[in-house]
């Protein structure tokens, strides 16, 4: 009985510490975008549409994209968002409808320029050992609009450059 108060105090402190959430990185995950894509290899230039959002107030992330000029270039992805994993980086592990899977790492770069954001995506198609990367630099014009430039790099060959305008909702 004499140890009940210290045990209760330590248990309460441990529960409070584990329930404390990490500071938000200030990144928006509820957004829609229109992209213009230039494909250096195939010459398939065109537009695409993308939407991504968190489900309710959870960390479950869903995304969808579709090529507006081509058939068969659509994908639905589902992932789980880990906020502020290390050094302010948010990481999302995802699986896609085209047997793809990967990790998205995003970070606000406000210490460099206010409104700047970086994103790196690593992915693979199911049954393939080919790595694919997307490198993106984005600028938040205001709380609702973002402009981004990205380069898709599959197997060490920069294949596609995209300019995207996004609306945060």
What is each of the regions a protein language model found here?
Residues 2-169:
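Outer-membrane beta-barrel proteins
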């Amino acid at each position: 009985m004499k140890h009940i108060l210290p045990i209760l105090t330590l248990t309460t402190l441990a529960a409070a510490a584990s329930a404390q959430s990490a500071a938000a990185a200030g990144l928006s995950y509820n957004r829609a975008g229109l992209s213009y894509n230039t494909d250096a290899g195939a010459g398939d230039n065109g537009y695409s549409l993308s939407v991504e959002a968190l489900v309710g107030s959870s960390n479950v992330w869903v995304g969808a994209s579709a090529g507006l000029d081509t058939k068969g270039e659509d994908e639905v992805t589902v992932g789980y968002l880990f906020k502020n994993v290390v050094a302010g980086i948010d990481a999302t592990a995802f699986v896609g409808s085209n047997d793809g899977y990967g990790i998205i790492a995003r970070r606000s770069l406000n210490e460099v320029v206010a409104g700047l954001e970086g994103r790196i995506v690593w992915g693979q198609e199911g049954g393939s050992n080919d790595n694919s990367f997307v490198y993106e630099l984005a600028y938040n014009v205001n709380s609702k609009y973002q402009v981004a430039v990205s380069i898709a790099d599959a197997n060490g060959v920069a294949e596609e450059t995209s300019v995207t305008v996004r609306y945060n909702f």
